[in-house]
Amino acid sequence: MLSVAELTRGLSDLVEDRYDDVWVEGELSDFTRAASGHCYFSLKDEDAQIRCVMWKHLTQYVYFEPEEGMQVRVNGHASVYERRGDLQIQAQAMRQAGKGAQQKAFEELKQTLQAEGLFAPERKQALPAFPDTIGVVTSGQGAAIHDIQSGLARRFPPAEVVLCPVKVQGLDAPRAVADAVAAFNDLPADDAQRPDLLIVGRGGGSTEDLWAFNEEVVARALDASNLPVVSAVGHESDVTIADLVADERAATPSAAAERVVPDRRDVADRVRALHDRLRSRVTGRLQDARQRVDALVASRAFHAPARRLEQHRQHLDALVDRLGRGGARAVDRARTRLAHLRDRLHALDPEQPLRRGYVHLTQDGTSVQSAESLQDGDRVRLHFQDGRRDAEVLPDDG
């Protein structure tokens, strides 16, 4: 024989075990926001209805005003309210149902932000030409961070990547992305972790998967950023609110890596071209000075009587003195600039770290970025200055 409490408790356990995380779509009915801030409502269709409750701390993530009769999708877990024996859903998230409703929410937010000027070209920040540190806001486990790191290492090895791993889909994703952008901006200017720009994004997915980047909280965070932001959400055909607000949009995470840094080969070509241009300018100025002196010596004034000769000789001495000082300064400036360019080109040489005793670790031809990416027994290759050796990853003895 079971008591009523035992029966309802047993039913509650069965329901919670089977329906611990479900999405339910239905018509919103009897929506009430209590003085406590909790929301109570029902979901119904033609054949049934079920009561729902959403606690106050979760209601802040509902980015629309629920209305009677609205078609919605609710995520949560089913349970039995034991006092009355009622079946209910404890809701964790609510979305407007249907692509039409989702598109409507997108367009309404887009119009609001556009009216405020958040998409205006004059608000866009320019990207630095040679960033030293790049902040990345994305999942720490997805393909996006791998694509970004690989692209940066291939094009511009001196650039350092600082990752702030966040959820990129689900209820907590919009706030997590916004908080990460704000955290990067809050770093002191002298902090080595403070980046020169941000890449914010994720890999491809469905419209629902990418929806965090259509939320207003993310748009506001990108607009408030003092650091230039490049959005890299999904694939080329996906356009989100974040793409419209960001300073620049890249079609994919890989494209973002290519956009934010120059190719080291292009940098080397530019340094060589600048060297040649400076040398040509200095040579031209010296040649022009020689021609002016030769013309003066060949002129009639150079053969005039002694008094005029002395005057022109003094004038010539003054010209030669000015030319010497100016030419020396020009040569010194050119020499200093060439030394700076030579040092910059030297710093871009990927072999330099190896000459200082460092080792470059690869696996299947790809650079290894962290110990966590290796498993016991993995075969890796060690690149030294004077050769390379293969090795096997052994278990960590602690």
Curated annotation (Swiss-Prot):
Keyword Hydrolase found: yes
EC number assigned by the record: 3.1.11.6
Chief localisation class: cytoplasm
Keyword DNA damage annotated: no
Disulfide bonds: none
Function: Bidirectionally degrades single-stranded DNA into large acid-insoluble oligonucleotides, which are then degraded further into small acid-soluble oligonucleotides.
Protein's UniProt name: Exodeoxyribonuclease 7 large subunit
Gene giving rise to this polypeptide: xseA
